[in-house]
């Protein structure tokens, strides 16, 4: 929806693409005063019906992979989930992880062009690995990744791949997930 796109742009403006565009303040929805639906037939007079979300609606939305936009007292309408259509057990089921992975792929692809047509030897592989490591290290600092590992040597750049004029760099990442639930168990003890 245009609401979600505008909210993602706002979230990127105040943080990074790998921060969840949900919650307060990243998920604040602007320009919306009511949420509901139109009742009536197209081409005839219609009526706007307010449809505030109930807790049951939010549960159903979550099960259907629809991100809820409830009204939060003191803040207004807020996108309050960040589900994608990916499989539930996938890390890519969260918008912030999916966008972080896309940012990484684009950043490496965009900046790797300087390595094209260089000699396909270990020195070039070492330089390429150093570039990828530096890029990913910055993303650790910027709270996109917990950790990463890269491999760019003879084990994944076999003689067959070199003969096909290919350079391979395997990357494994451990992205930082967003807090979606907070639990605060409180224990009351009798005075001693």
What residue spans do the PLM features occupy?
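Structured, hydrophobic secondary-structure cores that serve as assembly/anchoring elements
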Residues: 1-192
């Amino acid at each position: 929806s245009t609401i979600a796109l505008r909210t993602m742009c706002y979230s990127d403006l105040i943080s990074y693409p790998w921060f969840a565009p949900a919650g307060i303040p990243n998920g604040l929805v602007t320009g919306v005063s009511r949420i509901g639906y139109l009742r009536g037939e197209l081409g005839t007079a219609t009526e706007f019906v307010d449809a505030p979300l109930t807790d049951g609606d939010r549960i159903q939305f979550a099960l259907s992979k629809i991100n809820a936009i409830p009204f939060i007292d003191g803040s207004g309408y807020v996108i309050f989930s960040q589900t994608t259509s990916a499989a539930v057990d996938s890390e890519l089921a969260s918008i912030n992880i999916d966008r972080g992975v896309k940012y990484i792929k684009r950043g490496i692809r965009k900046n790797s062009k300087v390595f094209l047509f260089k000699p396909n030897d270990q020195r070039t592989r070492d330089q390429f690995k150093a570039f990828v490591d530096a890029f990913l290290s910055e993303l650790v600092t910027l709270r996109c990744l917990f950790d990463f590992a890269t491999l760019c040597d003879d084990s994944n750049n076999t003689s067959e791949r070199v003969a096909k004029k290919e350079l391979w760099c395997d990357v494994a990442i451990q992205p930082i997930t967003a807090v979606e639930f907070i639990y605060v168990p409180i224990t009351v003890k009798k005075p001693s």
